[in-house]
Curated annotation (Swiss-Prot):
Keywords: Isomerase, Periplasm, Rotamase, Signal. This is Peptidyl-prolyl cis-trans isomerase. It comes from the Bacteria. Gene3D superfamilies: Cyclophilin-like (2.40.100.10). Belongs to the cyclophilin-type PPIase family. It comes from Acinetobacter baylyi (strain ATCC 33305 / BD413 / ADP1). Residues 1-20 form the signal peptide. InterPro entries: Cyclophilin-like_dom_sf, Cyclophilin-type_PPIase_CS, Cyclophilin-type_PPIase_dom, E_coli_cyclophilin_A-like. It catalyses: [protein]-peptidylproline (omega=180) = [protein]-peptidylproline (omega=0). One of its GO terms (cellular component) is periplasmic space. GO terms for molecular function: peptidyl-prolyl cis-trans isomerase activity. Residues 21-181 form the PPIase cyclophilin-type domain.
Amino acid sequence: MLKRVAIVLGGLLISAHALANTMVEMKTNLGNIEIELYNNKAPISAKNFESYVKNNFYNGTIFHRVIPNFMIQGGGFETNMKEKATAAPIKNEASNGLANTRGTLAMARTSNPDSATSQFFINVADNNFLNASRTDAGYAVFGKVIKGMDVVDKIANVPTSTYGMHQNVPKQPVKIISVQIKSINTAK
């Protein structure tokens, strides 16, 4: 009997490990943020983000749009507000059952639902109006902050101004120093 229990528990541990999500650490000049990617519920978006991380794309970019009680957006601009060249856009996964709640990470996009590339945002509040519905394609959630929401809140409340055509730009750059994968999902 004990042998059967040990075999079942061993199988469960292997299954749980195979379903584990990728963990990412984002270092900013205001502190660190740890993020869990939802590889199984948002495979396209999570893989896309991981690809940019592996290519060091986010290193040296900024949070270029921050709005208190809404969200912080980054992943596309350098400190001089020069937009970085990206890979091709991905399919919108906003109908994956995940909601834009406080602390979740979602893909930023244009009015075209399938236009997301490298830019992402972290919800600072529950933003249910960003979820997919019958009349709106929504914004795909693909991860969640598991440590460092105090840093996210600090970023969301920095003084902002307008920079050219861009509104809500931090007066002092909020830099993404590096983004690194801490552990990776091995499930196929």
